[in-house]
Regions:
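Active-site-adjacent structural segments surrounding the nucleophilic cysteine of cysteine proteases
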Residues: 1-46, 92, 107-109, 148-149
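Extracytoplasmic/secreted envelope proteins and their assembly/folding machinery
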Residues: 18-22, 34, 38, 51, ...
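Sec-exported extracytoplasmic/periplasmic mature domains
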Residues: 25-30, 59, 63, 134
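Short loop/turn and capping residues at structural boundaries
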Residues: 36, 68-71, 90
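Noncatalytic regulatory segments and standalone regulatory/sensor domains
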Residues: 41-47, 62, 81, 85, ...
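Helix-adjacent hinge/juxtasegments
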Residues: 56-82
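Short beta-strand segments that buttress and anchor functional surface loops
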Residues: 87-93
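Short, surface-exposed coil-to-beta transition loops
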Residues: 96-101
């Protein structure tokens, strides 16, 4: 099962969060302006995007979002099965930093992400994802956000 989340590529090394928010908003047909999203998220080269700023930006742009920390893989699976792509914050082993991606599907014991850095249809096995479902400092665990409609 996979949802048609439009893929976008991040424009620099630190704006994966706003880029993922753009993907979600476009999926739901919510109008947005890329520059406004970057400004609302207060994204910066040194630290990227704060989870809460991402939530606030989504709400200011008209999306009703639900956030969960310390979530379970089953939460993501249930949301995907009910038609909701899920924005997640995870540790990207390829780049060694915290990263945002949009889970858009499930195939063969793997999550399929629309990932602004690693590409569209980027697979992460359930085991790998669960081991790395935290921010780069390990202060936020199993964080997810989705648009409630």
């Amino acid at each position: 099962m996979k949802h048609p989340v439009p893929h976008k590529t991040q424009s620099n090394t630190y704006n994966c969060g706003p880029t993922c928010l753009e993907m979600l908003l476009e999926f739901y047909g919510i109008p947005y302006d890329s520059e406004k999203i970057d400004a609302l998220c207060e994204t910066a080269p040194r630290h990227g995007t704060d989870n809460q700023k991402l939530v606030e930006a989504a709400e200011q742009l008209g999306a009703h979002v639900i956030v969960k920390e310390n979530a379970q893989l089953t939460d993501i699976i249930s949301l995907i099965e009910s038609g909701h792509p899920v924005l997640v914050n995870y540790f990207n082993c390829k780049s060694g930093v915290g990263h945002f991606g949009v889970v858009k599907g499930i195939e063969d014991q793997a999550l399929i992400l629309a990932d602004p850095k690693n590409g569209d249809d980027y697979p992460l096995t359930f085991d790998h994802f669960q081991q790395h479902w935290h921010n780069h400092t390990r202060t936020i665990h199993a964080w997810m956000m989705y648009v409630a409609r």
